[in-house]
Amino acid sequence: MLVAAAFGLVACGYGEEKLSVSKDDPDYNGAVLFSTHCSGCHTLSAAGTQGSGNRGERTQGPNLNQREETYEDALFAIQNGGFSGAIMPQNIVVGKEAEEIARFVAKYAGEDAETSPRPGETSSSP
């Protein structure tokens, strides 16, 4: 029972007040669900989450501000507990909720990611 309570605390979100996604955004519900179910481990500014990296816990998930994700990869991670060697709980959300979170992550993840220039573009880095 203590383990379940501890997991519940880790999985608790920070609340809607920290979301930077407006209520009229089609991905708003995904942001709320991410904040509720994923904030204990993952950092993503659009959801107002800081993950566990700043607490030094083993449950630190990827900082999604610095990592781009596709819808397919995000949904796979939700359904399968992350990728090889991950400690993410499998199916923490399922069905429509998993799809809404995956859409939200695909849209907002990677806002701080360094990206390589595409062919024909030049890098803005010095």
Model-assigned labels for residue ranges:
Residues 56-110:
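Extracytoplasmic electron-transfer domains, predominantly the class I c-type cytochrome c fold
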Residues 111-126:
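Short, low-complexity, Pro/Ser/Thr/Gly-rich segments in the mature regions of secreted, periplasmic
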Residues 8-11:
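C-terminal motif of bacterial Sec signal peptides marking the signal peptidase cleavage site
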Residues 15-19, 23-26, 31-60, 80-87, ...:
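Periplasmic/extracellular electron-transfer cofactor-ligation site
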Residues 1-4:
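Sec-dependent N-terminal signal peptides
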